[in-house]
Design a protein with these regions (language model features):
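Flexible glycine-/small-residue-enriched beta->alpha junction loops
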Residues: 1-7
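Flexible, active-site-adjacent loop/turn segments at secondary-structure boundaries
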Residues: 2, 14-17
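Short glycine/proline- and acidic residue-enriched helix-loop micro-motifs
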Residues: 7-15
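Glycine-rich phosphate/ribose-binding loops and adjacent secondary-structure elements
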Residues: 16-134
Length: 134
């Protein structure tokens, strides 16, 4: 995994160790904004699991973009059961993410970018029609 030799442990936590919940994440978003002098957009990446709740929480933390990766996406680290057998398919996740942004009143302020399982132009058209920005 990630080109490590056999016998070497890979640490790949499910979340960044700097935050335990939404309050910490909100502080980290503000910290990054200040560190970059507000010159770069802040993007939060989410795996599609508890889509509605996770997108609502992330949106309230103040990012410019929420990047949603459907179950068809992957990671460079993690056990097979987590990388291949869990998550919500992208096409099912997009409407939930869009609804969450609308419910917190931020659908016009936060771009929803999606990935994972997009195979062709028809899939791109479906994603856009379901509410993704890109």
């Amino acid at each position: 995994m990630r080109s490590l030799p056999p016998g070497i442990d890979q640490r790949s936590p499910a979340r960044h160790p700097d935050w335990l919940g939404p309050d910490d994440l909100s502080l980290k978003v503000q910290e990054v904004r200040e560190a970059t002098d507000y010159r770069i957009p802040i993007q939060l990446k989410l795996g599609a699991a508890r889509v509605y709740d996770d997108v609502r929480m992330a949106a309230k933390c103040g990012p410019d973009t929420i990047y949603l990766d459907g179950a068809e996406g992957s990671t460079g680290a993690g056990p097979h059961i987590a990388t291949e057998e869990t998550g919500i398919p992208l096409m099912a996740a997009i409407p939930e993410a869009r609804r969450a942004l609308e419910d917190v009143g931020l659908a016009d302020d936060i771009d929803l970018i999606v990935a994972g399982g997009i195979r062709n132009g028809a899939d791109v058209a479906k994603c856009l029609s379901l509410g993704a920005k890109a």
